[in-house]
């Protein structure tokens, strides 16, 4: 076997590192391996943990929130749930600090620990005195510090926040000692100084923070101090990373919420969130990007010579032939379409519940039985749905309703509602839906601003209805294709023949229309009478 040649510095990686909804990245390193975690909001399992040995190729190795006893998100509002985690490693133990927002059960800031970043992770240690959101942990010798952001008690302007710091006692699981106010941001009038991270480099302690809100005005600023408690002096060049001055036609926008890591060769790198709008619409949510960092005059400089997040960049110098071979992936991503068959082993995500709570056996790895709980996907309820992130501006998601199911516990009048959806929230979605009650019908449904409308509808023939009611194979084919981030083409059919089709504007799935903090998710679902459902087969995501 021929050896993989060492990469030359002319080879490039392509941003984003993690496509689709992967916001608020936080990164750390243990030995030769980097670990990265993202926000997941109302989706479970929560807080995906990725690993990499070269900062370019990332593998999903687990999730931090995997058990109902860790956290109950069943009541989470749209774009509520798990906000802005921080991952750190200290003396062989991994920590994640996070905040649960907009839920009826235990909420607020907490931390969890694990001996391995792959898990299992502990139950949360809640910190009721840790006000606000976006916590971070910083280790300085024997001291463990907890920082977060909150609204200023007497703000000078709307949206003014402050970064605060306090010692953490991990034995007692509580904050202790005096509280220190570190910073209110670099620019007066800029909202939401948030997402703080602390570092020690050379003689200084550094505070990195986002500000401007996680939209068009998003930015990264930095301050430094001689002591971790301050006082902090802002960089005269703040903000040190932003695309807000590039205008609305920029390919990469909303840059912010960065975290830094040092590689084994001494080089520094940043991960940050950003968006890739198409036709002024953001469907994919906020994604994870990479940039090199240099130090000049004791200040970090992001992507020296350019000062912005690159769409591509040089492969890190510490990447060796061995790490390239171990990744088993090309350094340059192929532009050719990729077809991904989805089955039980897919890392599905579910809003307000765990996928395993809904997923049943169906005879093979590429078939899934999905029974309704009675909850609906167009309400903030823990409905039976299995989703994957929409990660490309041109992509397709398809599934076949192979046959209907009825639980022995289901009785009385029943309605079966099963299908596929592209959803940004319960109030913003497009669905291709099979409805079976007194007749069998296929609907194409659009939900915009919480208002549902049936775009197209077609009754199926009596023979198909009889097969469906009897639980016999029916082969109802459902497909949605996003076309260049502008249009969603919906097609439904049987035996390869199209029964219904419609082209709908994709705007309903965008952040610009729906608001919130998440990206679009493609799902199979069941939301009829509790105990009814379907076996889904031929589930595919392709781009």
Language-model segments: which ranges?
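Carbohydrate-active catalytic/glycan-binding domains of CAZyme proteins
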Residues: 1-543
């Amino acid at each position: 076997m021929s050896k993989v040649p060492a990469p030359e510095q002319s080879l490039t990686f392509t941003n984003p590192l993690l496509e689709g909804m992967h916001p608020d990245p936080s990164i750390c390193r243990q030995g030769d391996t980097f670990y990265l975690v993202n926000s997941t909001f109302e989706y479970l399992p929560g807080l995906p943990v990725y690993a990499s040995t070269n900062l370019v190729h990332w593998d999903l190795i687990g999730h931090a929130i995997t058990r109902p006893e860790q956290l109950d998100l069943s009541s989470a509002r749209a774009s509520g749930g798990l906000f802005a985690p921080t991952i750190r490693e200290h003396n062989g133990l991994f920590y994640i600090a996070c905040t649960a927002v907009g839920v009826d059960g235990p909420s607020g800031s907490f931390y969890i620990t694990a001996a391995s970043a792959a898990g299992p992770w502990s139950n949360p240690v809640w910190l009721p005195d840790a006000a606000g959101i976006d916590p971070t942990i910083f280790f300085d010798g024997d001291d463990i510090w907890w920082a977060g952001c909150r609204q200023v008690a007497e703000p000078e302007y709307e949206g003014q926040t402050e970064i605060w710091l306090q010692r953490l006692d991990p034995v007692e699981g509580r904050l202790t000692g005096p509280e220190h106010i570190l910073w209110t941001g670099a620019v007066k009038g800029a909202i939401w100084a948030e997402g703080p991270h602390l570092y020690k480099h050379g003689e200084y302690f550094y505070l990195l923070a986002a500000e401007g809100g996680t939209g068009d005005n998003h930015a990264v600023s930095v301050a430094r101090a001689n002591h971790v408690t301050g006082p902090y002096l802002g960089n005269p060049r703040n903000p040190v990373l932003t695309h807000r001055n590039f205008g609305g036609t920029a390919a990469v926008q909303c840059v912010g919420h960065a975290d830094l890591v040092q590689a084994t060769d001494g080089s520094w790198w940043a991960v940050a969130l950003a968006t890739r709008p198409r036709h002024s619409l953001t469907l994919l949510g906020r994604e994870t990007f990479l940039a090199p960092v240099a130090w000049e005059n004791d200040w970090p400089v992001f992507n020296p010579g350019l000062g912005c997040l690159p769409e591509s960049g040089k492969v890190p110098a510490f990447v060796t032939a061995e790490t390239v071979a171990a990744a088993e992936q090309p350094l340059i991503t192929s532009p050719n379409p990729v077809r991904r068959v989805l089955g039980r082993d897919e890392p599905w995500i579910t809003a307000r519940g765990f996928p395993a709570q809904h997923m049943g056996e169906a005879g093979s790895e590429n078939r899934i039985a999905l029974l309704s709980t009675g909850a609906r996907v167009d309400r903030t309820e823990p409905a039976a749905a299995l989703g994957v992130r929409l990660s490309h501006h041109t992509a397709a998601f398809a599934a076949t309703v192979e046959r209907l199911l009825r639980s022995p516990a289901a009785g009385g009048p029943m309605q079966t509602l099963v299908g596929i959806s592209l959803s940004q929230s319960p109030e913003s979605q497009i669905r291709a839906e099979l409805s079976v009650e007194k007749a069998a019908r296929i609907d194409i449904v659009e939900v915009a601003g919480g208002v549902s409308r049936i775009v197209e509808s077609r009754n199926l023939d009596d023979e198909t209805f009889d097969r469906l009611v009897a639980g016999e194979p029916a082969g109802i084919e459902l497909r949605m294709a996003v076309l260049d981030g502008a249009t969603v083409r919906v097609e439904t059919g049987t035996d390869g023949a199209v029964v219904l089709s419609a082209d709908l504007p994709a705007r309903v799935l965008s952040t610009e229309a729906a608001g919130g903090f998440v990206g679009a998710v493609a799902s199979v679902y069941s939301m009829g009478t509790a105990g009814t459902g379907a076996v889904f087969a031929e589930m595919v995501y392709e781009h």
